[in-house]
């Protein structure tokens, strides 16, 4: 069965690119035509590229790999959080803090501080502190949760990035490239596809389009994880047979 259909892509408006004056010539190979001053993305290519991205991410997850979902623009925030949580992966959907990967140890210290504050609240420490101090601590905790909540359980650098709009997330893309972390991305007609390892040519401004494609990436991860679990169970069963 196909990973995604042309009908689904059309219904979600995946084919609508940017205005012709706002384009990157490197995206020409993914453009089908121009209509009313807007580029139309070649959905046959999108179908193939979604399949390529799906297989790549599924295999990565089957090998125990992790993916960091990145999408901080309004149209992507909700989908990125929901789909990353659904497949048990990490996400950044508010603001990419410079050095999130290239200065990972420092970011981990901020995550530790977030955990410390959460523990204080859970253990009732806030209840015995002065109101003014509690208000300041809560404010700090909420701010840390907002920016780092999606990577709270990420103990090491991810094995891949999934990015919605690499142009908007250029700092994340630059950090991943510097660290040789592969990038899968939803790439619109105004982006540079050369910076992305697995390009999904698509509209990155429509909520439905972003939701559809982000959901497929999450599906691939879940499928990979299930395959990994089944392989583990088969291995354990084989070991038991040998032991008998």
Swiss-Prot record:
PROSITE patterns: RIBOSOMAL_S2_1, RIBOSOMAL_S2_2. Gene3D superfamilies: Glucose-6-phosphate isomerase like protein, domain 1 (3.40.50.10490), Helix hairpin bin (1.10.287.610). InterPro entries: Ribosomal_uS2, Ribosomal_uS2_bac/mit/plastid, Ribosomal_uS2_CS, Ribosomal_uS2_flav_dom_sf. Signal peptide: none annotated. It comes from the Bacteria. Residues 229-244 have a biased composition (Acidic residues). CDD domains: RPS2. Residues 224-244 are annotated as: Disordered. GO terms for molecular function: structural constituent of ribosome. One of its GO terms (biological process) is translation. Keywords: Ribonucleoprotein, Ribosomal protein. One of its GO terms (cellular component) is cytosolic small ribosomal subunit. Belongs to the universal ribosomal protein uS2 family. NCBIfam families: rpsB_bact. HAMAP family: Ribosomal_uS2_B. This is Small ribosomal subunit protein uS2. It comes from Desulfitobacterium hafniense (strain Y51).
């Amino acid at each position: 069965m196909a990973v995604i259909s042309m009908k689904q892509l059309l219904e979600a408006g995946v084919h609508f690119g940017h205005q012709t004056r706002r384009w990157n010539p490197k995206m020409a190979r993914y453009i089908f035509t121009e209509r009313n001053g807007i580029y139309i993305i070649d959905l046959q290519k999108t179908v193939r590229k979604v399949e390529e991205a799906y297989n790549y991410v599924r295999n990565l997850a089957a090998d125990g790999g992790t993916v960091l979902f990145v999408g901080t623009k309004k149209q992507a925030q909700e989908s990125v959080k929901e789909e990353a949580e659904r497949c048990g992966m990490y996400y950044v959907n508010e603001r990419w803090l410079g050095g999130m990967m290239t200065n990972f140890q420092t970011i981990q210290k901020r995550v530790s501080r977030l955990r410390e504050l959460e523990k204080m609240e859970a253990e009732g420490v806030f209840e015995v502190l002065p109101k003014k101090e509690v208000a300041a601590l809560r404010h700090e905790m909420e701010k840390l949760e907002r920016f780092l909540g999606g990577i709270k359980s990420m103990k090491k650098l991810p094995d891949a990035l999934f990015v919605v709009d690499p142009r908007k997330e250029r700092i994340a893309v630059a950090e991943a490239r510097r660290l040789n972390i592969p990038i899968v991305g939803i790439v619109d007609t105004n982006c540079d596809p050369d910076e992305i390892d697995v390009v999904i040519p698509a509209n990155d401004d429509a909520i439905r389009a972003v939701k559809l494609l982000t959901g497929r990436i999450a599906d691939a991860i879940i499928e990979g994880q299930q395959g990994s679990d089944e392989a583990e169970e088969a291995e354990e069963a084989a070991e038991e047979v040998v032991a008998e």
